[in-house]
Amino acid sequence: MTFAVRTGRVKEGNGMSKINGWHHLTLSTDGVQEDYDFYTKTLGLYSVKRTVLFDGVLPVYHLYYGAKGGAASTIITTFPFRKPGVYGRRGSNQSKVIMQSIPVGSADFWVERLNGAGLTAVKGSRFGLTRVMFAHPCGIAHELVENPADTRDPIVKDGTGITAAQGIKGIYGGAVSVQDRTAMDDFMTIALPLKKVADSSEGLMYEVPQTAGVVQMVEVLHEPGVPQGTWTLAGGTIHHMALNTGDEDNQLKLRAHIEGLGFTDISEQKDRNYFKSCYVRSPGGALFELAWTVPEGWAKDEPADAIGSTLVFPPWFEDRRAEMEAGLEPAAF
């Protein structure tokens, strides 16, 4: 979809932007054990929630990682699909890179650490920011970005060998590969809407509003020659990127705004137990989510000081607990 009027007509402060930072990023991976070890050991994140895929009938883990208390904008979630054997194809019109923020000056530490763990990591730069570029064991691109504007505390966990000088601070953003640069630019600045802060041969960059003052971004990479990637929940691909609306009122107002622009396939609100979600596909197909956390948050089914320590199911899956547990891929958590 391309809008009839070009970018720039939506003014900041018009009351339409209902976003306050990132909520989470979600990808479909391969093996459960390699996924869990990658995030909790190599990257030093905490296990925040261990549950199952709420959609469909396949017994698949849904694993959440982030800061110890599960703060919004630190959460990465995964669906490991090795046992079902469902795999996707990485390509254009799809989210391409998971980006997390690290302290300035820590890139060399991470290059050494990641290479030492058997993951090929190199230092690079895009939009003037130093990055460590590497991949999840299943092949999904990741970057650790030295973000001088990130005031969050680093995530530090005993036994990992990662200190406050190196710890990941949370989500920096995500990069999306597109074939149609103009249509995506319109979606980002008019539908969501986000402020465009860079437009160059490297791509487009949009700032995610954040009242805490943490600079977070969406990057759009123009790759017209790259074949279309898959949209389904399938191993080896990023499924969606979720923006935080803070509450239900903001979510529903933004949903109505997006639907009114012609995105009539934006989903109804879905109950994700810990948060409520609406999903919308950008013009090429990359999936975005609008989410807000319910008052109980991660402590809805576990003690607040023990989140992510047990396997939990939503109430509507309790009658399938034994069946689903038997069908899950074995792993040591």
What label would you give each PLM region?
Residues 3, 15, 21-30, 49-51, 59-64, 82-113, 130-135, ...:
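Vicinal oxygen chelate
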Residues 4-5, 10:
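Acidic, Ala/Val/Gly-enriched low-complexity intrinsically disordered segments
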Residues 17-85, 92-99, 107-108, 112, ...:
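An N-terminus-focused feature that recognizes amino-terminal "leader" regions
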